[in-house]
Amino acid sequence: MKKLIALLVFSGLALAGCGSHQSDTKTSSSSTSETKQTTTSSQDASEQKKLEQLRKDFNDAMTNENAVFPQLSNEVAEDEAVVKITTSQGDITVKLFPKYAPLAVENFLTHAKEGYYDGLLFHRVINNFMIQTGDPKGDGTGGESIWKGKDKSKDSGTGFENEYSPYLYNLRGALAMANSGPNTNGSQFYINQNKADISSKLPTDRFPAKIIEAYKEGGNPSLDGKHPVFGQVIDGM
C-alpha cells in the first residue's frame, strides 16, 4: 500500500461560517407548523432551482462548442485551487474546482489544512481502476466530513450531498469523493487511474463530444453521477 505522507496546500479558499439566531423557545403548535411548512417550501424551491440550473448546464455542455471543461487543461484558472499530495511514491499535483464542487473542495482543503490526511495510507489500490485514501482507520470504514456533528444542514450524520456538474467527469487523473451511496460523502477520496480507451461505449446523448474524446485516455465513466469529481491531477500521474 502506498503511504500518504503529507498534503501541502499551495492555494486555498476563504471559508465562510454560518450563524444561527434562536428566538423564544415558547411557541405555539400553529407557529411551529408554519415554520416547518416554510422551511420545507424553501428547501423545495432551492432544489427546484438547482435542478433547473443543472438542466441549463447540461444543455450547454452538450450543445455549446465553446463550453469549458476545466479538467481538459493543465492551466490553473483564477477560480481554482492547487494542492500537492506528497507520497512515498512521489508527488501528485492536483487542481481543484470550487466553482463546480464547493462542498467537496471546502471539505478537502479544511481537512488538509488541519492535518487530517497526514500519514494516511492509500488503503485501496486497484491497477487500471483507481487509488483511494482519506480514511484514518486505513481500512475503508472510517472518516467523516468537516461538518459532521457541527452543521446538520450540510451533514446530518451520514455525510454531505453529492455535487454533480456536467462539466466534470471521472476521467483518468480525476479526483473524486469515495462514498457508500448518494449523499454519504465524508473524508475519503480517490484518483482515477484506468488507462483503457472506453470512449466507444459512451452514448453521445449523455456525454459531451469533448469528454468522449478525453475518455480515450482512460477513466471510469461508470462512476459518473455517483461519486462527485472535484479535482484533476495535472502532474505526477
PLM-predicted stretches and their roles:
Residues 18-237:
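Cyclophilin-like peptidyl-prolyl cis-trans isomerases
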